[in-house]
Amino acid sequence: MSIAVASASIPEPVRYEPLRVMVVDDSVVIRGLISRWIEAEPDMVVAASLRTGLDAVNQVERVKPDVALLDIEMPELDGISALPQLLAKQRNLIIIMASTLTRRNAEISFKALSLGAADYIPKPESTREASAAEIFRHDLLQKVRSLGARVRRKVQTGPGAVAAPAIVRAREPAPVPAAGHAPAVPLLRRALSLTAPRVLLIGSSTGGPQALMTLVADIGAVIDRFPVLITQHMPPTFTTILAEHLARASRRPAHEGIDGEIIKPGQIYLAPGGKHMRVARQGGNTVIALDDGPAVNFCKPAVDPLFISAIEVWQSAIMAVVLTGMGSDGMRGGKDVVAAGGSVIAQDEASSVVWGMPGAAANAGICAAILPLNQIGQKLVRVFAGDRS
Protein backbone atom coordinates (compact mmCIF):
# COMPACT_ATOMS: atom_id res chain seq x y z
CA MET A 1 0.00 0.00 0.00
CA SER A 2 1.55 3.25 -1.05
CA ILE A 3 1.05 6.47 0.90
CA ALA A 4 1.08 9.75 -0.95
CA VAL A 5 2.93 12.45 0.93
CA ALA A 6 2.06 16.01 0.02
CA SER A 7 5.16 18.15 -0.16
CA ALA A 8 4.89 21.51 1.54
CA SER A 9 5.06 24.29 -0.99
CA ILE A 10 7.63 26.96 -0.28
CA PRO A 11 6.17 30.42 -0.82
CA GLU A 12 8.01 32.59 -3.28
CA PRO A 13 9.81 35.56 -1.74
CA VAL A 14 7.95 38.84 -2.09
CA ARG A 15 9.29 40.87 -4.99
CA TYR A 16 8.86 44.61 -5.37
CA GLU A 17 8.70 46.93 -8.32
CA PRO A 18 11.71 49.26 -8.60
CA LEU A 19 11.15 52.62 -6.96
CA ARG A 20 10.06 55.15 -9.55
CA VAL A 21 12.06 58.36 -9.12
CA MET A 22 11.20 61.69 -10.73
CA VAL A 23 14.27 63.93 -11.08
CA VAL A 24 13.43 67.64 -11.35
CA ASP A 25 16.33 70.05 -11.85
CA ASP A 26 17.03 72.78 -14.39
CA SER A 27 20.67 71.66 -14.71
CA VAL A 28 21.07 69.03 -17.41
CA VAL A 29 24.39 68.06 -15.81
CA ILE A 30 22.83 67.38 -12.40
CA ARG A 31 19.87 65.57 -13.96
CA GLY A 32 22.18 63.39 -16.00
CA LEU A 33 24.43 62.60 -13.05
CA ILE A 34 21.56 61.69 -10.72
CA SER A 35 19.81 59.69 -13.42
CA ARG A 36 22.93 57.59 -14.07
CA TRP A 37 23.31 56.86 -10.37
CA ILE A 38 19.68 55.81 -10.03
CA GLU A 39 19.66 53.65 -13.16
CA ALA A 40 22.74 51.80 -11.86
CA GLU A 41 20.76 50.60 -8.82
CA PRO A 42 18.72 47.39 -9.17
CA ASP A 43 15.85 48.61 -6.98
CA MET A 44 15.10 51.98 -8.56
CA VAL A 45 14.45 53.55 -11.95
CA VAL A 46 14.21 57.08 -13.33
CA ALA A 47 10.51 57.54 -14.07
CA ALA A 48 10.91 61.10 -15.34
CA SER A 49 13.72 63.58 -15.90
CA LEU A 50 12.29 67.10 -15.96
CA ARG A 51 13.65 70.65 -16.12
CA THR A 52 11.15 72.74 -14.15
CA GLY A 53 8.66 72.50 -11.32
CA LEU A 54 5.92 73.29 -13.83
CA ASP A 55 6.89 70.24 -15.90
CA ALA A 56 6.69 68.12 -12.74
CA VAL A 57 3.25 69.43 -11.76
CA ASN A 58 1.92 68.85 -15.28
CA GLN A 59 3.26 65.30 -15.56
CA VAL A 60 3.13 63.84 -12.05
CA GLU A 61 -0.32 62.23 -12.46
CA ARG A 62 0.76 60.49 -15.65
CA VAL A 63 4.23 59.48 -14.45
CA LYS A 64 3.10 58.27 -10.99
CA PRO A 65 6.52 58.45 -9.29
CA ASP A 66 7.15 57.06 -5.81
CA VAL A 67 9.86 59.61 -5.01
CA ALA A 68 10.56 63.08 -6.41
CA LEU A 69 13.95 64.79 -6.16
CA LEU A 70 12.97 68.45 -6.39
CA ASP A 71 15.46 71.26 -6.90
CA ILE A 72 14.67 74.51 -5.09
CA GLU A 73 15.86 77.02 -7.69
CA MET A 74 14.29 76.51 -11.13
CA PRO A 75 12.73 78.67 -13.87
CA GLU A 76 8.96 78.92 -14.47
CA LEU A 77 8.04 77.30 -11.14
CA ASP A 78 10.54 76.80 -8.33
CA GLY A 79 10.64 73.85 -5.97
CA ILE A 80 8.93 75.43 -2.96
CA SER A 81 6.03 76.57 -5.19
CA ALA A 82 5.76 73.20 -6.94
CA LEU A 83 5.81 71.22 -3.67
CA PRO A 84 2.21 71.80 -2.49
CA GLN A 85 0.87 71.39 -6.03
CA LEU A 86 2.62 68.02 -6.38
CA LEU A 87 1.28 66.80 -3.04
CA ALA A 88 -2.22 67.99 -3.96
CA LYS A 89 -2.09 65.76 -7.05
CA GLN A 90 -0.33 62.79 -5.40
CA ARG A 91 -0.77 62.85 -1.63
CA ASN A 92 1.65 60.02 -0.82
CA LEU A 93 4.48 61.26 -3.03
CA ILE A 94 7.82 61.25 -1.19
CA ILE A 95 9.51 64.58 -1.98
CA ILE A 96 13.19 65.22 -1.25
CA MET A 97 14.26 68.83 -1.69
CA ALA A 98 17.71 69.51 -3.17
CA SER A 99 19.61 72.75 -2.72
CA THR A 100 23.03 74.31 -2.45
CA LEU A 101 24.36 75.29 0.98
CA THR A 102 23.19 78.88 1.29
CA ARG A 103 21.29 80.43 4.18
CA ARG A 104 18.38 81.30 1.88
CA ASN A 105 18.11 77.73 0.61
CA ALA A 106 18.43 76.34 4.14
CA GLU A 107 15.48 78.50 5.21
CA ILE A 108 13.49 77.35 2.18
CA SER A 109 14.32 73.70 2.96
CA PHE A 110 12.95 74.10 6.49
CA LYS A 111 9.80 75.68 5.07
CA ALA A 112 9.50 72.76 2.66
CA LEU A 113 9.59 70.29 5.56
CA SER A 114 6.71 72.13 7.20
CA LEU A 115 4.77 71.97 3.90
CA GLY A 116 5.12 68.20 3.56
CA ALA A 117 8.54 67.44 2.07
CA ALA A 118 9.97 64.23 3.51
CA ASP A 119 13.59 65.36 3.59
CA TYR A 120 16.24 67.53 1.97
CA ILE A 121 19.68 66.91 0.51
CA PRO A 122 22.43 69.50 0.04
CA LYS A 123 23.95 69.61 -3.43
CA PRO A 124 27.73 70.03 -3.67
CA GLU A 125 28.97 73.28 -5.16
CA SER A 126 30.83 71.24 -7.76
CA THR A 127 30.44 67.61 -8.79
CA ARG A 128 33.96 67.65 -10.23
CA GLU A 129 35.44 66.96 -6.79
CA ALA A 130 35.30 63.18 -6.46
CA SER A 131 34.80 63.05 -2.68
CA ALA A 132 31.96 65.60 -2.71
CA ALA A 133 30.22 63.81 -5.58
CA GLU A 134 30.56 60.44 -3.83
CA ILE A 135 29.10 61.77 -0.57
CA PHE A 136 26.21 63.30 -2.54
CA ARG A 137 25.63 59.99 -4.38
CA HIS A 138 25.72 57.92 -1.17
CA ASP A 139 23.35 60.24 0.70
CA LEU A 140 20.95 60.62 -2.21
CA LEU A 141 20.58 56.88 -2.87
CA GLN A 142 20.24 56.13 0.84
CA LYS A 143 17.48 58.71 1.23
CA VAL A 144 15.60 57.51 -1.86
CA ARG A 145 15.81 53.89 -0.73
CA SER A 146 14.94 54.47 2.94
CA LEU A 147 12.11 56.93 2.36
CA GLY A 148 10.81 55.05 -0.67
CA ALA A 149 10.49 51.85 1.37
CA ARG A 150 7.20 53.22 2.71
CA VAL A 151 5.61 53.18 -0.74
CA ARG A 152 7.26 50.21 -2.45
CA ARG A 153 4.85 48.25 -4.65
CA LYS A 154 4.81 44.46 -4.85
CA VAL A 155 5.37 42.98 -8.30
CA GLN A 156 2.05 42.23 -9.98
CA THR A 157 1.85 39.01 -11.98
CA GLY A 158 -0.85 37.23 -13.93
CA PRO A 159 -3.49 38.42 -16.38
CA GLY A 160 -4.60 41.32 -14.15
CA ALA A 161 -1.15 42.87 -13.89
CA VAL A 162 -0.97 46.55 -14.75
CA ALA A 163 1.91 47.90 -16.79
CA ALA A 164 4.11 50.51 -15.14
CA PRO A 165 3.66 54.08 -16.39
CA ALA A 166 5.90 55.23 -19.18
CA ILE A 167 9.29 56.80 -18.55
CA VAL A 168 9.38 60.53 -19.27
CA ARG A 169 12.49 62.49 -20.26
CA ALA A 170 12.92 66.24 -20.28
CA ARG A 171 12.89 68.11 -23.55
CA GLU A 172 15.85 70.42 -23.43
CA PRO A 173 15.13 74.05 -24.37
CA ALA A 174 16.89 75.51 -27.36
CA PRO A 175 20.21 77.05 -26.33
CA VAL A 176 20.12 80.79 -25.74
CA PRO A 177 23.07 82.69 -27.21
CA ALA A 178 25.44 84.22 -24.62
CA ALA A 179 23.45 83.34 -21.89
CA GLY A 180 4.00 52.70 10.98
CA HIS A 181 2.89 51.15 12.77
CA ALA A 182 4.82 49.96 15.83
CA PRO A 183 6.48 46.52 15.43
CA ALA A 184 4.21 43.51 16.09
CA VAL A 185 6.94 41.61 17.96
CA PRO A 186 7.44 42.93 21.51
CA LEU A 187 10.94 44.28 22.01
CA LEU A 188 13.02 43.83 25.14
CA ARG A 189 12.83 46.76 27.53
CA ARG A 190 15.38 47.58 30.21
CA ALA A 191 14.61 49.16 33.55
CA LEU A 192 15.35 52.86 33.85
CA SER A 193 18.63 53.72 35.49
CA LEU A 194 18.41 54.14 39.26
CA THR A 195 20.73 57.15 38.90
CA ALA A 196 19.00 60.50 38.49
CA PRO A 197 19.95 61.88 35.05
CA ARG A 198 21.94 65.12 34.94
CA VAL A 199 22.05 65.59 31.16
CA LEU A 200 19.80 64.93 28.16
CA LEU A 201 21.42 63.73 24.92
CA ILE A 202 19.41 63.50 21.69
CA GLY A 203 20.34 62.00 18.31
CA SER A 204 18.30 62.31 15.11
CA SER A 205 18.49 62.28 11.32
CA THR A 206 15.78 62.01 8.64
CA GLY A 207 12.62 63.60 9.99
CA GLY A 208 14.64 64.95 12.90
CA PRO A 209 14.12 68.71 12.53
CA GLN A 210 10.34 68.46 12.90
CA ALA A 211 10.64 65.84 15.66
CA LEU A 212 13.15 67.95 17.57
CA MET A 213 10.97 71.04 17.45
CA THR A 214 8.05 69.03 18.80
CA LEU A 215 10.16 67.49 21.56
CA VAL A 216 11.90 70.64 22.82
CA ALA A 217 8.54 72.40 23.02
CA ASP A 218 7.39 69.64 25.41
CA ILE A 219 10.38 69.60 27.78
CA GLY A 220 10.79 73.16 29.00
CA ALA A 221 10.94 71.97 32.61
CA VAL A 222 13.87 69.69 31.73
CA ILE A 223 15.78 72.34 29.76
CA ASP A 224 15.48 74.84 32.61
CA ARG A 225 17.33 72.55 35.04
CA PHE A 226 19.63 70.45 32.85
CA PRO A 227 21.81 70.85 29.74
CA VAL A 228 20.46 69.40 26.49
CA LEU A 229 22.92 68.32 23.78
CA ILE A 230 21.69 67.38 20.31
CA THR A 231 23.31 65.83 17.26
CA GLN A 232 21.18 66.05 14.11
CA HIS A 233 22.65 64.78 10.84
CA MET A 234 22.78 68.06 8.95
CA PRO A 235 25.29 70.13 6.97
CA PRO A 236 26.73 73.55 7.87
CA THR A 237 24.37 76.53 7.54
CA PHE A 238 21.42 74.18 8.02
CA THR A 239 22.41 73.59 11.66
CA THR A 240 22.59 77.35 12.23
CA ILE A 241 18.99 77.68 11.03
CA LEU A 242 17.89 74.63 13.03
CA ALA A 243 19.30 76.10 16.25
CA GLU A 244 17.23 79.25 15.65
CA HIS A 245 14.10 77.15 15.11
CA LEU A 246 14.79 75.14 18.29
CA ALA A 247 15.16 78.36 20.28
CA ARG A 248 11.77 79.56 19.02
CA ALA A 249 10.08 76.20 19.58
CA SER A 250 11.43 75.75 23.12
CA ARG A 251 11.47 79.43 24.14
CA ARG A 252 14.89 78.68 25.60
CA PRO A 253 18.43 79.53 24.42
CA ALA A 254 19.66 77.22 21.66
CA HIS A 255 22.81 77.53 19.56
CA GLU A 256 25.50 75.53 17.81
CA GLY A 257 28.11 74.23 20.23
CA ILE A 258 31.38 76.21 20.36
CA ASP A 259 34.68 74.47 21.01
CA GLY A 260 35.72 74.97 24.64
CA GLU A 261 32.34 76.40 25.67
CA ILE A 262 31.30 75.58 29.24
CA ILE A 263 28.14 73.45 29.31
CA LYS A 264 25.40 74.89 31.54
CA PRO A 265 21.82 74.00 32.48
CA GLY A 266 19.10 75.93 30.69
CA GLN A 267 20.83 75.69 27.31
CA ILE A 268 20.32 73.62 24.16
CA TYR A 269 23.59 72.82 22.37
CA LEU A 270 23.42 71.61 18.75
CA ALA A 271 26.31 69.92 16.97
CA PRO A 272 27.42 72.25 14.14
CA GLY A 273 27.26 70.83 10.62
CA GLY A 274 30.51 69.25 9.48
CA LYS A 275 31.91 68.62 12.99
CA HIS A 276 31.36 65.97 15.64
CA MET A 277 30.32 67.40 19.00
CA ARG A 278 31.83 65.67 22.02
CA VAL A 279 32.05 66.69 25.67
CA ALA A 280 35.12 66.75 27.92
CA ARG A 281 36.35 67.80 31.34
CA GLN A 282 38.53 70.91 31.41
CA GLY A 283 39.69 71.92 34.85
CA GLY A 284 36.58 71.93 36.98
CA ASN A 285 34.25 72.48 34.03
CA THR A 286 32.45 70.35 31.46
CA VAL A 287 32.98 71.79 27.98
CA ILE A 288 32.06 71.27 24.33
CA ALA A 289 34.84 69.61 22.32
CA LEU A 290 34.38 69.89 18.55
CA ASP A 291 36.06 67.25 16.44
CA ASP A 292 36.94 67.66 12.76
CA GLY A 293 37.92 64.00 12.35
CA PRO A 294 36.52 61.57 9.78
CA ALA A 295 32.84 60.75 9.42
CA VAL A 296 31.39 58.16 11.79
CA ASN A 297 28.62 55.89 10.46
CA PHE A 298 28.95 57.91 7.21
CA CYS A 299 27.88 61.00 9.18
CA LYS A 300 29.50 64.20 10.38
CA PRO A 301 28.27 65.19 12.87
CA ALA A 302 27.45 61.73 14.22
CA VAL A 303 25.50 60.73 17.31
CA ASP A 304 27.83 58.01 18.63
CA PRO A 305 30.74 60.39 19.44
CA LEU A 306 28.42 62.55 21.57
CA PHE A 307 26.91 59.61 23.46
CA ILE A 308 30.25 57.88 24.07
CA SER A 309 32.14 60.99 25.17
CA ALA A 310 29.39 61.91 27.65
CA ILE A 311 30.06 58.75 29.66
CA GLU A 312 33.45 60.08 30.76
CA VAL A 313 31.71 63.11 32.28
CA TRP A 314 28.32 61.95 33.56
CA GLN A 315 28.83 58.16 33.88
CA SER A 316 25.43 56.64 34.73
CA ALA A 317 23.61 59.99 35.03
CA ILE A 318 22.75 60.10 31.30
CA MET A 319 19.40 60.04 29.54
CA ALA A 320 19.87 59.47 25.79
CA VAL A 321 17.06 59.70 23.24
CA VAL A 322 17.22 58.33 19.69
CA LEU A 323 14.72 59.92 17.32
CA THR A 324 13.72 59.23 13.72
CA GLY A 325 16.50 58.71 11.21
CA MET A 326 18.03 56.29 8.72
CA GLY A 327 20.99 54.07 9.50
CA SER A 328 22.05 52.89 12.95
CA ASP A 329 23.96 55.88 14.35
CA GLY A 330 23.38 56.14 18.09
CA MET A 331 23.00 52.41 18.66
CA ARG A 332 26.64 51.75 19.55
CA GLY A 333 26.80 54.86 21.74
CA GLY A 334 23.48 53.89 23.31
CA LYS A 335 24.88 50.48 24.20
CA ASP A 336 27.80 52.16 25.95
CA VAL A 337 25.45 54.53 27.80
CA VAL A 338 23.43 51.58 29.10
CA ALA A 339 26.59 49.62 29.98
CA ALA A 340 27.69 52.63 32.05
CA GLY A 341 24.37 52.61 33.91
CA GLY A 342 22.47 55.27 31.95
CA SER A 343 19.17 55.01 30.06
CA VAL A 344 18.04 55.14 26.42
CA ILE A 345 14.60 55.98 25.01
CA ALA A 346 13.75 55.46 21.31
CA GLN A 347 11.00 56.90 19.14
CA ASP A 348 8.55 54.25 17.96
CA GLU A 349 8.14 53.10 14.37
CA ALA A 350 4.68 54.52 13.76
CA SER A 351 5.70 58.11 14.52
CA SER A 352 9.13 57.95 12.82
CA VAL A 353 9.73 59.15 9.28
CA VAL A 354 12.38 56.42 9.04
CA TRP A 355 12.72 53.81 11.80
CA GLY A 356 16.41 53.16 11.20
CA MET A 357 18.30 54.74 14.10
CA PRO A 358 15.58 54.26 16.74
CA GLY A 359 14.83 50.80 15.35
CA ALA A 360 18.49 49.80 15.68
CA ALA A 361 18.49 50.93 19.31
CA ALA A 362 15.19 49.17 20.00
CA ASN A 363 16.26 45.92 18.36
CA ALA A 364 19.54 45.98 20.29
CA GLY A 365 17.50 45.64 23.49
CA ILE A 366 18.95 48.74 25.14
CA CYS A 367 15.83 50.88 25.50
CA ALA A 368 13.97 51.65 28.71
CA ALA A 369 11.04 52.84 26.58
CA ILE A 370 9.98 52.92 22.91
CA LEU A 371 7.40 55.67 22.57
CA PRO A 372 5.47 57.78 20.06
CA LEU A 373 7.02 61.20 19.61
CA ASN A 374 4.16 62.94 21.40
CA GLN A 375 4.78 60.85 24.55
CA ILE A 376 8.56 61.16 24.77
CA GLY A 377 8.50 64.69 26.19
CA GLN A 378 6.02 63.73 28.93
CA LYS A 379 8.18 60.74 29.85
CA LEU A 380 11.34 62.85 30.04
CA VAL A 381 9.69 65.46 32.27
CA ARG A 382 8.64 62.71 34.70
CA VAL A 383 12.04 60.98 34.67
CA PHE A 384 13.99 64.19 35.25
CA ALA A 385 11.56 65.01 38.09
CA GLY A 386 12.50 61.75 39.82
CA ASP A 387 10.05 59.16 38.45
CA ARG A 388 11.83 55.81 37.89
CA SER A 389 8.80 53.79 36.81
UniProtKB/Swiss-Prot annotation:
Its EC number is 3.1.1.61, 3.5.1.44. Keywords: Chemotaxis, Cytoplasm, Hydrolase, Phosphoprotein. The modification 4-aspartylphosphate is found at D71. The keyword Membrane does not apply. GO terms for molecular function: phosphorelay response regulator activity; protein-glutamate methylesterase activity; protein-glutamine glutaminase activity. GO terms for biological process: chemotaxis. SUPFAM superfamilies: CheY-like, Methylesterase CheB, C-terminal domain. It catalyses: [protein]-L-glutamate 5-O-methyl ester + H2O = L-glutamyl-[protein] + methanol + H(+); L-glutaminyl-[protein] + H2O = L-glutamyl-[protein] + NH4(+). Residues 20-138 form the Response regulatory domain. It is found in: Cytoplasm. It is an enzyme of class 3 (hydrolase). SMART domains: REC (SM00448). It comes from the Bacteria. The active site is at S205, H233, D329. Phosphorylated by CheA. Phosphorylation of the N-terminal regulatory domain activates the methylesterase activity. GO terms for cellular component: cytoplasm. Residues 193-387 form the CheB-type methylesterase domain. Belongs to the CheB family. Contains a C-terminal catalytic domain, and an N-terminal region which modulates catalytic activity. Involved in chemotaxis. Part of a chemotaxis signal transduction system that modulates chemotaxis in response to various stimuli. Catalyzes the demethylation of specific methylglutamate residues introduced into the chemoreceptors (methyl-accepting chemotaxis proteins or MCP) by CheR. Also mediates the irreversible deamidation of specific glutamine residues to glutamic acid. This is Protein-glutamate methylesterase/protein-glutamine glutaminase 1. It comes from Rhodopseudomonas palustris (strain BisB18).
